[in-house]
Swiss-Prot record:
Protein family: Belongs to the major facilitator superfamily. Proton-dependent oligopeptide transporter (POT/PTR) (TC 2.A.17) family.
GO MF term list: transmembrane transporter activity
TM stretches of this protein: 32-52, 57-77, 88-108, 124-144, 173-193, 202-222, 259-279, 302-322, 333-353, 374-394, 422-442, 451-471
Pfam families named among the record's database cross-references: PTR2 (PF00854)
InterPro entries registered for this protein in UniProt: MFS_trans_sf (IPR036259), POT_fam (IPR000109)
Membrane topology of this protein: Multi-pass membrane protein
Record carries keyword Metal-binding: no
Tissue: Expressed in roots.
Keyword entries, A-Z: Membrane, Transmembrane, Transmembrane helix, Transport
Organism of origin: Arabidopsis thaliana (Mouse-ear cress)
Gene: NPF1.3
Protein's name according to its UniProt entry: Protein NRT1/ PTR FAMILY 1.3
GO-annotated cellular components: membrane
Amino acid sequence: MDQEALLVGRTLLKRGIPTIPFILASQALEKLAYFGLVPNMILFLTVEYGMGTAEAANILFLWSAATNFFPLVGAFIADSYTGRFPLIGFGSSISLTGMVLLWLTTIIRPECDKLTNVCQPTTLLKSVLLYSFFALTAIGAGGVRSSCLAFAADQLQPNQTSRVTTSSLETLFNWYYFSVMVACFLSQSLLVFVQTTYGWQIGFGVSVAAMALSVALFFAASPYYVRFQKPTRNSRNPWKLCRVQQVEDLKSLINVIPIWSTGIILSLVTACQVSFIVLQAKTMDRHTFIQGFEIPPGSYGIFLVISFLLFLGLYDLVIVPLLSWALREPFRLGVMVRMWAGYVISVLCISALAATEYARRKTARDESGTKLSAMWLLPYMILGGIAEALNTIAQNEFFYSELPKTMSSVATTLSSLNMAAASLISSWIITIVDVTTYGSWITENIDEGHLDYYYWLLVGLSLLNVLYFVWCKKSYGKCSI
């Protein structure tokens, strides 16, 4: 037994474990490249392609929905047909190709009339390149994000039948999410600054370089990866034989769907308003206490990330220990309580944004020419980060504990499905609002529109969502955690 354990340890030290940093670094660089494009994309579409605000927002919502939905498809393909390594390699290469196509749109000069010197905002070729970028990066995300974390966990196993210790998995997950958050921080600060200061060509070029490095790092360690064989013929289509266990798994999934659906509005309130916030920040006073320095419009989302991280640290390291000491017994908020608190805070969050937009528009239309400070966006960012920290982690704990162990991979992808559904619903709401208000709420010049009315509509939906969650909680009954 000791010789077998020693052999297993040697196998992991030679092959699997040393490759984990390559996988995590590759994943972090993919996130850096992708999220570095997101904040300013609304400006790129409206300025370089001459799109209206509503049209550009709809395109970005659909792109976000596809990017968050395809990982579920990728997970099914990897588990049933291809295995994880080929799918990650394919997804990374496809994403890189898409980003190169986007970068090419910044090189192609617009067609200009020599007499009038009037230039067309876009051409057919540039439009084809743009939409190809959206399609390829969405498909690529399905390959990379569906399998990267699971493939890293595979490196802790010398063979397909061995088990991974809980402490090893916890360490891996901690490093994974830490690397992702660092990538998000850098993308919304460094990359957005480069785009704002040096232009689209250099800014998008940095994302291409980061994605190219991601692909290179992933394939660099390919001879040393632990790779499990793809499923056999008998296991390729397991749903052809509908066993009792599979029926029970399906019942468990159906039971948690109502609770899952309550998270859609929260994602709509926090993550789906990034594009509009960039447009707001662009028209506000972004000066800081550092003389001569302005925060780029696309970088304000970084405050939501900081709020998320700070609240998590404060909750785990200060609030819980202090309350446990005061009560003289272990203190812990249940998942349902944390979800409810997240939904209540989301109402305050979007209300703060609506009030800020009302004040911003009123100040902008004032003939004095003054601008409202962009720091008034911080209440929305801070409350949004707290709401996400409370709700997202609680939902993940709930799904992981309530669904059978055979559905652990499904449990970890439900959060991304929330974002996909929220992006689709956002697109529908924007379309309906734009049609019913005859374009008077969401306009190309937001000073002339009523973006605050749109936000108050989201406040109403958030209030209804709180009531809906209470009903779902009562219907579900008592959960195991």
